[in-house]
A protein has these predicted regions:
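Hydrophobic face of amphipathic alpha-helices that form TPR/SEL1-like repeat modules
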Residues: 1-67
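A structured beta-alpha segment of the ubiquitous adenosine-cofactor-binding alpha/beta core
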Residues: 170-171, 238-261
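Generic beta-strand/beta-sheet core signal
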Residues: 58, 121, 136, 147, ...
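Conserved small-residue-rich beta-alpha loop and adjacent elements
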Residues: 157-234
């Protein structure tokens, strides 16, 4: 006898009347409670780092629930994390894209295997309902798989070019990593919008300094856990924790990183875009939200359309860039 294949979880396939899903989630909530309230260090060069004091994270569902105590990093911790990423980058790039793809796919598989546990922690941490939390965790795994698949399908973007009729000339376009990337993730998609940019940078041969939102720090912890358990070497992805005005600012303003990905507010994102590339061109990818329309066709079922628009606009309190804002 073989186990039945696991149902693929997506935002589209999730249903509130799925009793099996609810039973698995409820069991995961009980398991997740055992992880609440503990202390969580930063991870720099594969080593735990205590930082300068701690900050507490409490659940928006119930302020009596202590999600955890997290290390409060300093500017010096960020500098050390950047140095660790720099020291690891050449060996990571030399590993070869095929091996990096293998490690990213393994990370994605671990996240999928732990979907209920990670979703339960996310629901407690940021207050998402269980369906949205489950959808996000599986989306996180799929984003990692996407970057891995793009590298595979395109042979890591190594392409022969025209020799202009000279048989002695061999010209190729090749892909090379930039070096060290900073990734600053938001609270509203604390796993997906960390896993996506982190894995995109890693599969390309870059190393990473990752800062989760302080209100999404547990999701940062589980991403680092999955990367470690998949076999990603120490120092390749480093996690710093703490306030945006110190830890985030040190990362965003550093001349020692080669690119940055940020998801968050318009004010911070525009300031980052203006300042990060001022001295010289560097990749600066900022996502600051949008105005998302819904179009209701004449042939639509109006009851279903109205419910869909309502859920799209006000799910998770509307606190997401994908929330419907125009009809």
């Amino acid at each position: 006898m073989t186990d039945a294949p696991r149902t693929k979880i997506t935002y589209a396939t999730l249903r509130a009347d799925n009793e099996e899903l609810h039973a698995a989630f409820e069991a995961a909530v009980e398991a997740a409670r055992a992880r609440l309230g503990g202390g969580h260090p930063m991870i720099i060069a594969g080593q735990e780092r205590a930082g300068e004091g701690e900050f507490e994270l409490r659940s928006p569902i119930d302020q009596d629930i202590l999600v955890g105590r997290f290390a409060k990093g300093t500017r010096a911790d960020v500098q050390d994390a950047i140095a660790a990423a720099r020291a690891s980058q050449k060996a990571w790039a030399a590993l070869g894209w095929e091996r990096r793809v293998e490690l990213m796919n393994r990370t994605a598989d671990l996240i999928s295997e732990r979907v209920h546990e990670y979703a339960a922690l996310m629901a407690i941490e940021v207050g998402k309902n269980r369906l949205e939390a489950l959808g996000e965790v599986e989306e996180s795994a799929d984003l990692i798989r996407y970057y891995a698949r793009m590298a595979e399908e395109n042979g890591f973007y190594e392409k022969p070019m025209d020799n202009l009729g000279d048989p002695a000339t061999h010209t190729r376009s090749v892909s090379r990593p930039y070096g060290v990337f900073g990734v600053i993730a938001p609270f509203n998609f604390p796993l997906a919008l960390a896993a996506g940019p982190v894995s995109g940078a890693l599969v390309a041969g870059n190393t990473v300094v990752f800062k989760p939102a302080s209100t999404g720090a547990m999701s940062g912890v589980v991403l680092m856990e999955a990367l470690r358990d998949a076999g990603v070497p120490d120092g390749v992805c480093n996690m710093v924790l703490g306030p945006g005005e110190t830890v985030g600012d040190e990362l965003a303003s550093s001349d020692a990183i080669d690119g940055i990905v940020f998801t968050g507010s318009y004010v911070v994102g525009m300031g980052l875009q203006r300042n990060f590339t001022k001295a010289y061109p560097r990749p600066c990818i900022v996502e600051m939200g949008g105005k998302n329309p819904a179009i209701v066709m004449k042939s639509a079922d109006l009851d279903k359309a109205a419910e869909g628009i309502m859920r799209a606009a006000f799910g998770f309190g509307g606190q997401k860039c994908s929330a419907n804002s125009r009809v």
